[in-house]
């Protein structure tokens, strides 16, 4: 019987020679560095713009202000309020023939501070939080946490905050009941063991010695913050402060084959998309990489995929190329092809019952395609067309990229969604495609370095073909 009659998704580690192994681990190190230093959307955008500019990308606002035009080979980026980024490499073909698009998100599940967060209770200073995205709340207690973000004062001054990452920094955390007194707590459903209103951060316990103030611990904390950041309590109202796991991403496993780190959903696909884009020197079709905010809460708002920022920026690009009208814009979007660069769930041998083995993703077997996501009867899904999938199979086979297909768990087990359906509304071809993770949405997620490498190569192959 011919060997090609049956399908087998092979382990990517088996094919690497010494040169490729060095590339795999080097990419893993770059990715670890990125997610260790970029734990918020703003931090991601700031860092990626610095790197992009070194590779020749220019801010579209500067180009518009100078009245310049664009031509084949030009590299442009657009910054959406410091929390979203779109990159363009102008191709040879007319823009109305369509784009090659990679799209990932750079927001991740976390705890956000409320607008009036600071209070004192029994001589302890605390911060109120509101969790962001889908989390198992019990996973966020008794962990060392860091505070990242910005405080914007009334005069418009932006104060950057990052506390808990340096070895000399303090860390913070959410406490839990000692097991000796937890009999009632342990009888609760896992979803109720820790309630949302229980996710309060302990930040101090020393009372202010001087004065007659009643809330002396709270007052002392504000004194420290005022001395360090020149802020008052009211400035929390116009702050965007995110509570995230403290510490760097680490190698995982004796063989260092995996990465453990916070925010891999979806910065792992954002980073591999970014690297694939930087590798492009010229293109037949114009290439676009979209990195957006707010995917974890429905892609809404000014910095989410549902905003008009992407469409408006594409219109600007077409105008700068001297090729804009409304009909051409619509044709360009309709004729485009996109990889919705988002993570998938890896099969976990500790929890096999939620997955269907024949349609699951596995660590080490390469980039994962999810033909559809959604839940129950494919509700809310983007269901990719088979003609498009066949084209992608051809491209990846040609470039020797390891790939696999998967669903997000068993039928009726649950489900999820991405930004794919939003771009598909333009009529373009879209499929979800990214890295499989263990511990998805937990404070510390796990990925395979082989999958990171194959995903970056898969994105590069897509852009180049």
UniProtKB/Swiss-Prot annotation:
Residues involved in Zn(2+) binding: 105, 180, 441
List the GO cellular component terms: cytoplasm
Q: Which coenzyme or cofactor does it need?
A: Zn(2+)
Q: Which CDD domains match?
A: M18_API (cd05659)
Q: A GO term (biological process) for this protein?
A: proteolysis
Disulfide connectivity for this sequence is none
Q: Which domain of life is it from?
A: Bacteria
Q: Which UniProt keywords apply?
A: Aminopeptidase, Hydrolase, Metal-binding, Metalloprotease, Protease, Zinc
Q: What is this protein called?
A: Probable M18 family aminopeptidase 1
């Amino acid at each position: 019987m011919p060997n090609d009659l049956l399908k087998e998704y092979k382990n990517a580690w088996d094919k690497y020679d010494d040169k490729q192994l060095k590339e795999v681990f080097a990419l893993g190190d770059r990715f670890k560095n990125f997610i260790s230093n970029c734990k918020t959307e703003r931090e991601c955008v700031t860092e990626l713009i610095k790197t992009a500019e070194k590779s020749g990308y220019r801010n579209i606002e500067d180009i518009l202000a100078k009245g310049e035009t664009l031509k084949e080979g030009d590299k442009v980026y657009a910054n959406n309020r410091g929390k979203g980024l779109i990159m363009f490499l102008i191709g040879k073909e007319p823009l109305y023939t369509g784009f090659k698009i990679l799209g990932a998100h750079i927001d991740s599940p976390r705890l956000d501070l409320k607008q009036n967060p600071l209070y004192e209770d029994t001589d302890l200073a605390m911060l109120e939080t509101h969790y962001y995205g889908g989390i198992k709340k019990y996973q966020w207690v008794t962990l060392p946490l860091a505070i990242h973000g910005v405080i914007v004062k009334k005069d418009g001054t932006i104060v950057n905050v990052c506390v808990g990452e340096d070895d000399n920094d303090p860390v913070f955390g959410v406490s839990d009941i000692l097991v000796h007194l937890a009999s009632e707590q342990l009888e609760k459903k896992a979803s109720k063991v820790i309630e949302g209103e229980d996710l309060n951060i302990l930040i101090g316990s020393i009372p202010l010695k001087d004065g007659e103030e009643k809330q002396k611990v709270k007052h002392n904390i504000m004194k420290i913050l005022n001395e360090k950041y020149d802020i008052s309590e009211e400035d929390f109202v116009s702050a965007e402060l995110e509570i995230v796991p403290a510490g760097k991403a680490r190698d995982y496993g004796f063989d260092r084959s995996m990465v453990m780190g916070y925010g891999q959903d979806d910065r792992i696909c954002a980073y591999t998309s970014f690297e694939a884009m930087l590798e492009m020197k010229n293109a037949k079709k114009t290439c676009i990489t979209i990195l957006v905010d707010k995917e974890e809460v429905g892609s809404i708002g000014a910095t989410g995929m549902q905003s008009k920022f992407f469409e408006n920026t594409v219109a600007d690009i077409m105008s700068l190329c001297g090729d804009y009208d409304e009909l051409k814009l619509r044709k360009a979007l309709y004729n485009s092809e996109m990889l919705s660069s988002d993570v998938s769930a890896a099969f976990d041998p500790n929890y096999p019952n939620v997955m269907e083995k024949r349609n699951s993703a596995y660590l080490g077997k390469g980039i994962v395609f999810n033909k559809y996501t959604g839940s129950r009867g494919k509700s809310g899904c983007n269901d990719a067309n088979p003609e498009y999938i066949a084209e992608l199979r051809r491209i990846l086979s040609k470039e020797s990229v390891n790939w696999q297909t998967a669903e997000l768990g068993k039928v009726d087990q649950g489900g999820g969604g991405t930004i794919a359906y939003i771009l598909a509304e333009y009529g373009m071809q879209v499929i979800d495609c990214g890295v499989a993770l263990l511990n998805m949405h937990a404070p510390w997620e796990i990925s395979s370095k082989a999958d990171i490498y194959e995903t970056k190569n898969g994105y590069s192959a897509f852009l180049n073909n």
